Curated annotation (Swiss-Prot):
Gene3D superfamilies: Zinc/RING finger domain, C3HC4 (zinc finger)
Subunit structure, interactors included: Interacts with MARCHF2 and STX6.
Provenance organism: Rattus norvegicus
Protein's name according to its UniProt entry: E3 ubiquitin-protein ligase MARCHF3
Enzyme Commission identifier(s): 2.3.2.27
Lineage: Eukaryota, Metazoa, Chordata, Craniata, Vertebrata
Zinc finger residue ranges, RING-CH-type: 63-123
Amino acid sequence: MTTSRCSHLPEVLPDCTSSAAPVVKTVEDCGSLVNGQPQYVMQVSAKDGQLLSTVVRTLATQSPFNDRPMCRICHEGSSQEDLLSPCECTGTLGTIHRSCLEHWLSSSNTSYCELCHFRFAVERKPRPLVEWLRNPGPQHEKRTLFGDMVCFLFITPLATISGWLCLRGAVDHLHFSSRLEAVGLIALTVALFTIYLFWTLVSFRYHCRLYNEWRRTNQRVILLIPKSVNIPSNQQSLLGLHSVKRNSKETIV
């Protein structure tokens, strides 16, 4: 094992002045206590006279909060809801609340863990149409939906009454042998209903597309996992202690 001349003072980067040496990683346990806390020092020998990396990690004093695992999303413990370990993540990232995970999977529209890429067994249920009508999405989509609904409720009876009056007038003109006026009124009625149906169809297709997209990305996710993945309360403190010890031994290059 080859190392350069490096100082071992905690929280101070070593001063290395040795010549070029092959890259060698060394991890030392100084065995000393500073303020009652053990210090873990990692050194990497110099290459071409330059220090590659040095990490000093302090193992924090054990506390009741460090001994208990917590949800990696909300950072809360198991006082309100049991913690699960449904994927292959370990340590402090391996525990999570069921409700937090279901909410995250619903918001991200995914079915796998973003860290270990473990695919969860989930059941997706579409949300009802009433919920979309209450909250269709962004503000401009709300205004568009509200405006089109008002226009539809206002234009539909207006177009119906106008078409009926035009047809009634065309029939009266036919009785009085005024064919030109009757043809004009019939053409006006056809144009009126064509424009109305075209606008209704375009608006309906637009909002159906928004609803289908909202329904696809806002599904209710139910996590299908066995009860065996729940972390018993009598093992939570032991799990937290092991995770703290394991994290204290990690080093960074």
